[in-house]
Each structure stands twice: as structure tokens, then as C-alpha cells.
Curated annotation (Swiss-Prot):
Top-level division of the source organism's lineage: Eukaryota
Keywords of this entry: Allergen, Cell wall, Cell wall biogenesis/degradation, Glycosidase, Hydrolase, Secreted
Protein name listed in UniProt: Polygalacturonase
Entry's transmembrane regions: none
């Protein structure tokens, strides 16, 4: 049997056992109050290891809907020949201006282990402030239909002071 485990910071936990010769279709993973949960993890967890991933997959799936993950929506680990069909990723929109920092800043997309190929599209940011971040806004992957408006930032203690 294969176990599918959902666990969100000790508030939600579910385990599903699936016979090894059966396929799993139609999983929906959603967080009940996405803004509250996302903001909690964004403000209180400084490293990525403390934020939950909506679902981690170690075998093939189809017809997945993933909603409002505080970190990654989908992670593939220790897989060969993974095939994903009919995936939908839904997310909420933060209505208020975003303040980010201190830290790395905001990264759109991730190259992943071994610089695997990744593409990101349809990201629109309007109104963000970056305080004491190393990078501000950045992307390490191919992006399409991405806009940043009204984004600004400053350092209270510059990381790389000007040369004298």
C-alpha cells in the first residue's frame, strides 16, 4: 500500500492508504482560511523548512486540484517517470500591500534540484515594499506574463556599502 499524508502545522492531519496496484484520481488539497494560514507562515517562519507543502508526490497522479499552499504547491521526490495530467493550482489573492524583509526577498520560481527546468506564468504584483532584503525581486527561471508595479525598497543597514 501507498500512504498519502496531509499534515499542516499540527492543525490538519489525514492519512490515506491506497493499494499499490490502484491509481488515485481527484484529490483536492485546500487550506480552510488561506489568507490567515499563509500570512501566519509568511510572518512567523523564517526558513522554508517550517512551512508546509500542500502535497508531496512519490508516484504518478492525475486530476489534482491544489489550493492555497503556504509554500510549494507540489513537490516531487525520489521519482522516475512522473506523469501529471489535468493539474489545477488555485491560489488566493492578497488584497493588501505586501511588505517583505528582512531576508532574501521575493523569488518567482525555483530551479530546483540539479537546475531542473521550470517555467512560471501569470504572476502580477502590485504594491510591494522590500526592507533590508538581499535581492528584492528576482527570477531564476523562464517567466511569461509577469508584471511588477509599485514595488520599492530600502536598506536600513546596507549589506554592500559604497566604495570609498
Amino acid at each position: 500500500d501507498v500512504a498519502i499524508v496531509f499534515n499542516v502545522e499540527h492543525t490538519l492531519s489525514a492519512v490515506f492508504l491506497v493499494p499499490a496496484n490502484k491509481k488515485v484520481d481527484g484529490i483536492i488539497a485546500a487550506y480552510p482560511d488561506p489568507v490567515k494560514i499563509w500570512m501566519h507562515f509568511a510572518r512567523t517562519v523564517c526558513n522554508d523548512k517550517g512551512r508546509p507543502t500542500a502535497i508531496k508526490i512519490d508516484f504518478s497522479k492525475s486530476e489534482l486540484t491544489l489550493m492555497n499552499s503556504p509554500e510549494f504547491h507540489l513537490v516531487f521526490g525520489e521519482c522516475d517517470g512522473v506523469k501529471i495530467q489535468g493539474i489545477k493550482i488555485k491560489r488566493f489573492e492578497i488584497e493588501k500591500d505586501l511588505t517583505c524583509g528582512p531576508g532574501h526577498g521575493m523569488s518567482i520560481g525555483s530551479l530546483g534540484k540539479g537546475n531542473s527546468r521550470s517555467e512560471v506564468s501569470f504572476v502580477h504584483l502590485d504594491g510591494a515594499k522590500f526592507i533590508d532584503t538581499q535581492n528584492g525581486l528576482r527570477s531564476a527561471v523562464k517567466i511569461e506574463d509577469v508584471t511588477f508595479k509599485n514595488a520599492n525598497g530600502y536598506y536600513t543597514n546596507p549589506l554592500n556599502p559604497p566604495c570609498k
